[in-house]
């Protein structure tokens, strides 16, 4: 027993707008009284119209427009899964494993058979599609990218040792607080030559006062303007030049007065009696004393500077401008320019060498640009249009040839003529399509001609010996082939295309579209046939 599910009549009509709907079966499933009255007036595919039937038809149409009419459906619709089957066929083209490709084709053929019968529910078709993608994903997993392994190692570089020294610092700070108060003060040193007392025990880290500012660094003063900074720099330069020749002899003697941090307590020299417990660790050394300020030099007691030696006028530097001249220039806003120094003749680069250097640089840049443009043009995809508008290469492909080969290639990728045949036929067809695909990416005239010859050979290889559309209809009911067997009709149209009978294929498709004007497959094949016919005529006329 089939499971019934209800849906609105409006959504049912939208989903099945490309399918043939039986009127008697449709009105039987609509759950309204008006639909049942209309169904009772259908005799031999003919509706008997009267006043009551017309009123019921108007009421039903109003309910469908307002989305108030519902119906029950038992089977799945073919149009929901048709696009999925087309995508699956395109994916199988890139599979090179023969056994896997054959199993994928068997799954596609089984789904198409169920869709043509129309007695399977959506869940079964969904499971079959899921099985197809499971097989296809396993085929892709077996080929990992080569850079997957180095990328996975990058996150393993971790530096966890950064916060480790934090607890050790805390222990060093707490040890002096526990040991120093219990230790006796050190006795005076027996050395009579050193009058300095032993250093006091260092305070704990928590009791240390903040470090005083360095005496040599003055506090930052208020910001000065440009004139004051210039005057201050001139004064410092004059003081530095005055103190430069002064070298006091007492400086080395005064630099050795700081020896207090090197004194050790007496207990470090005397032997200690053995004890059961280990001796406590010695207290840490006191922090180093701040550097001593430079000794003050008394200029009055310093020896006079050595007498200046007269230099020749050529070796003397130019006199520095006086302070009054600098201030007057700053007030007036005029600044004297320094005289330009003449470059020696040996350092001057001749003009001819400069032009040669510029020409070499431009030539290298133009060559790199040409190489980049050549690479970018070879990477154009087959979907780009107008790719050769700005290409002036002598070997560029003709636009009608490119469109003709692309249309024929698209017919082969979605063809049903060779998908369910023997494995040898499928293997040869897919190998040829795999060879044609890189030729379409680099669209030169040579590659397009090669692709065209390969596709024409493949067309003659997969063409049927007899086309069903050429034989007349047999029987009293002369129904067209697309009504009785749509899958065979698709194969017959593709056979006409592969035999280059584009006009016959176009006539059959136009006739089929009179019955089903919105059918997706009919419109797609008609578009390909028209492209092939037009571009073939252009190619023959240009040749």
Curated annotation (Swiss-Prot):
GO terms for biological process: actin-dependent intracellular transport of virus. GO terms for cellular component: host cell; host cell cytoplasm; host cell nucleus. InterPro entries: WH2_dom (IPR003124). Keywords: Host cytoplasm, Host nucleus. Residues 147-222, 235-325, 373-400 are annotated as: Disordered. Coiled coil: none annotated. Its main location: host cell. One of its GO terms (molecular function) is actin binding. It comes from the Viruses. It is found in: Host cytoplasm; Host nucleus. Residues 182-221, 271-321 have a biased composition (Pro residues). Residues 226-246 form the WH2 domain. Residues 375-384 have a biased composition (Polar residues). Plays a role in the transport of the nucleocapsids from the cytoplasm toward the host nucleus together with the host actin-polymerizing Arp2/3 complex. Forms a complex with proteins C42 and E27. Interacts with host actin-related protein 2/3 complex. Interacts with protein Ac102. This is Protein P78/83.
């Amino acid at each position: 027993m089939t499971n019934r599910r209800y849906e609105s009549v409006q959504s049912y009509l939208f989903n099945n707008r490309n399918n043939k709907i039986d009127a008697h079966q449709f009105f039987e499933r609509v759950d309204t009284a008006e639909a049942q009255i209309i169904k009772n007036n259908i005799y031999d595919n003919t509706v008997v119209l009267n006043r009551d039937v017309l009123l019921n038809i108007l009421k039903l149409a109003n309910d469908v427009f307002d989305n108030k009419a519902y119906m029950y459906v038992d089977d799945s619709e073919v149009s929901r899964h048709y696009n999925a089957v087309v995508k699956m066929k395109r994916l199988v083209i890139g599979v090179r494993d023969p056994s896997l490709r054959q199993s994928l084709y068997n799954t596609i053929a089984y789904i198409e058979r169920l869709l043509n019968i129309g007695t399977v529910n959506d869940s079964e078709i969904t499971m079959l599609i899921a099985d197809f993608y499971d097989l296809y994903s396993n085929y892709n997993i077996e080929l990992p990218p080569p850079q997957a392994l180095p990328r996975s190692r990058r996150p393993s570089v971790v530096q966890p040792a950064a916060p480790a020294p934090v607890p050790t610092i805390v222990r060093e700070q707490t040890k002096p607080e526990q040991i120093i108060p219990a230790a006796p003060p050190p006795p005076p040193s027996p050395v009579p030559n050193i009058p300095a007392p032993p250093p006091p025990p260092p305070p704990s880290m928590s009791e240390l006062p903040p470090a005083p500012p360095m005496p040599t660094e003055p506090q930052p003063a208020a910001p000065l303007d440009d004139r004051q900074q210039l005057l201050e720099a001139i004064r410092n330069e004059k003081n530095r030049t005055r103190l430069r020749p002064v070298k006091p002899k007492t400086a080395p003697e005064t630099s050795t007065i700081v020896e207090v941090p090197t004194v050790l307590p007496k207990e470090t020299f005397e032997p200690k009696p053995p004890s059961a417990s280990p001796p406590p660790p010695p207290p840490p050394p006191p922090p180093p004393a701040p550097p001593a300020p430079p000794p003050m030099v008394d200029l009055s007691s310093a020896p006079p500077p050595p007498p200046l030696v007269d230099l020749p006028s050529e070796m003397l530097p130019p006199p520095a401008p006086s302070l009054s001249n600098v201030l007057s220039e700053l007030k007036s806003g005029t600044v004297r320019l320094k005289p330009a120094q003449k470059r020696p003749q040996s350092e001057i680069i001749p003009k001819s060498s400069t032009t040669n250097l510029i020409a070499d640089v431009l030539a290298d840049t133009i060559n790199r640009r040409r190489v980049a443009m050549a690479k970018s043009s070879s990477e154009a995809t087959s979907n780009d249009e107008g790719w050769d508008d700005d290409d002036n290469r002598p070997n560029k492909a003709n636009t009608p040839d490119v469109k003709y080969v692309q249309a024929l290639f698209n017919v082969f990728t979605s063809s049903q003529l060779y998908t369910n045949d023997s494995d040898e036929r499928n293997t040869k067809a897919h190998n040829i399509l795999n060879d044609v695909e890189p030729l379409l990416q680099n669209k030169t005239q040579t590659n397009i001609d090669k692709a065209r010859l390969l596709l024409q050979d493949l067309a003659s290889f997969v063409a049927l010996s007899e086309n069903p559309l050429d034989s007349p209809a047999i029987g009293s009911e002369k129904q067209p082939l697309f009504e009785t067997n749509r899958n065979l009709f698709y194969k017959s149209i593709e056979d006409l295309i592969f035999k280059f009978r584009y006009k016959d294929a176009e006539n059959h498709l136009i006739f089929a579209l009179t019955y089903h004007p919105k059918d997706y497959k009919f419109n797609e094949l008609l578009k390909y046939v028209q492209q092939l016919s037009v571009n073939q005529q252009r190619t023959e006329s240009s040749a």
